[in-house]
Amino acid sequence: MAPGFTISFVNKTIIVTGGNRGIGLAFTRAVAAAGANVAVIYRSAKDAVEVTEKVGKEFGVKTKAYQCDVSNTDIVTKTIQQIDADLGAISGLIANAGVSVVKPATELTHEDFKFVYDVNVFGVFNTCRAVAKLWLQKQQKGSIVVTSSMSSQIINQSSLNGSLTQVFYNSSKAACSNLVKGLAAEWASAGIRVNALSPGYVNTDQTAHMDKKIRDHQASNIPLNRFAQPEEMTGQAILLLSDHATYMTGGEYFIDGGQLIW
């Protein structure tokens, strides 16, 4: 950072959905390192509470994990209200929860569609809406960062001229990116900013299970010639949540190693 450029979230509460693993955990650690109290929303991971508590102890902030199905409106609303009561006024949200199904399009089912879209689109909307409603009731400003993906713009390859068969994931991320624009437009007058952060290929447990040939092919087509580390996603998220980004809303910011240059 340039001299004098600092970001502090001391005495602020930030929610991270899917904040117990992968990119989400990197977000959780980053906002905690900046002084925020952090609420981690998770679906079913057995170690989520332990992971969240460990972050709190490491950075000396309040942290708490909340089990919640982001596609369930009533549960999301109650969870957001509980976070506000437990950790103090919510100042930011990173809507990061996401899932994928990798299958040829001819084999995909309605259940697959619901599984992906319930989390990646409706779950994002559900969480953003619950937080925004709370802010509107309190006449409070806030910032939302939605984790979309560079896959909102492309069809990922598995090999030269070969498609990675995840059409529901890619289309859900395109929907997610456009959802951000709509929410940003509706809530701007209330001082609520909404932006999308769109990662490229990142080293996570999920990508680690991919075929090495696919990973190598994908990395070879990135101008920076490698997958990112989860921590490399955090700088843009921290900026968007901060007071240094008060004139930024409705944008989609790609952290993709230059992939979309091509």
Swiss-Prot record:
Keywords: NADP, Oxidoreductase. It catalyses: D-mannitol + NADP(+) = D-fructose + NADPH + H(+). GO terms for biological process: mannitol metabolic process; protein homotetramerization. It comes from the Eukaryota. Coiled coil: none annotated. Disulfide bonds: none annotated. InterPro entries: NAD(P)-bd_dom_sf, SDR_fam. The active site is at residues 149, 169, 173. Its EC number is 1.1.1.138. NADP(+) binds at residues 23, 69, 96, 129, 169, 173, 202, 204, 206. Belongs to the short-chain dehydrogenases/reductases (SDR) family. Homotetramer. This is NADP-dependent mannitol dehydrogenase.
